[in-house]
Amino acid sequence: MSIARRTTLSKFLIEQQRETNNLPADLRLLIEVVARACKAISYNVSKGALGEALGTAGSENVQGEVQKKLDILSNEILLDANEWGGNLAAMASEEMETFFPIPANYPRGEYLLVFDPLDGSSNIDVNVSIGTIFSVLRCPDGKQATEESFLQPGTEQVAAGYAVYGPQTVFVLTTGNGVNCFTLDREVGSWVLTQSNMQIPADTREYAINASNARHWYEPVQRYVDELNAGKDGPRGDNFNMRWIASMVADVHRILNRGGIFMYPADKRTPDRPGKLRLMYEANPMSFIVEQAGGAATTGTQRIMEVQPTGLHQRVPVFLGSKNEVERVTGYHAEGEGK
């Protein structure tokens, strides 16, 4: 690709703003700030042990999970980058118990930013792809945010995206008008458009699930996976492959590129907790992206983006990816009225 003919993220967003007239300037600027923060996170991730940021921080987040040093650093990078620009009323992070209002000494805007600063951080020390997930909502209360301001269904998202820090660093974005992927050119420091209007195939022969939990699954999931594992001799009449990276951004990025279904169901170990993934920080933004790419995303019983949040750290079961497979496993839940 000729350097002169490259489309950078900034150019792409400005053209979107001109052509569609549904991308406000403040939202465009907010997305660019998030993308710059992801570049800074990518730089720190890539330094590895040389950056003295590997290992645990000796603390736990609100989820009760041990925090990695890079979890905390990534969270701080996103907060510091976005607090002063005048585009936001508040932010909420998977790593923080309560939301973060924009300090009084900075101007406030009309948007809310929700993020998982470093998804898949258990993989940091073993050099497996990890990433950042984010979602943007409008603040319904003008510029004075409360926790309730964030509790909007995913259908209210105005933008969502993720960055993957892997062999390449990529930034995947939707503003409700398709899904596009930008690759970080480290030589010039720009995000360059490398994939336009990404589409997930409706059919697939790949699935992603943590099979070590099989003994805990509810019957609809057990039935679905058993059929896949039966291969050509089973009811599906075809062979399926399992892929599991244990990093949602990496698994979803693969599915976005070549199809597949990602599953993180509820299970019998914690019947009072419906799933592990967080609705606001992971499930909603990924569902927005997947649906914009022609896929589907459900909890097994309803469309993820129609779930009404009841708390910042609410968890949900997740089934997303190739439309026909998501519809099949969702249908099994309906037949069994199970989880």
Swiss-Prot record:
It comes from the Bacteria. The keyword Magnesium applies. This is Fructose-1,6-bisphosphatase class 1. Its main location: cytoplasm. Keywords: Carbohydrate metabolism, Cytoplasm, Hydrolase, Magnesium, Metal-binding. Binds 2 magnesium ions per subunit. GO terms for molecular function: fructose 1,6-bisphosphate 1-phosphatase activity; magnesium ion binding. Disulfide bonds: none annotated. Its EC number is 3.1.3.11. Mg(2+) 1 binds at E94, D116, L118. Its cofactor is Mg(2+). The gene is fbp. GO terms for cellular component: cytosol. Substrate binds at D119, G120, S121, S122, N210, K276. It comes from Burkholderia ambifaria (strain ATCC BAA-244 / DSM 16087 / CCUG 44356 / LMG 19182 / AMMD) (Burkholderia cepacia (strain AMMD)).
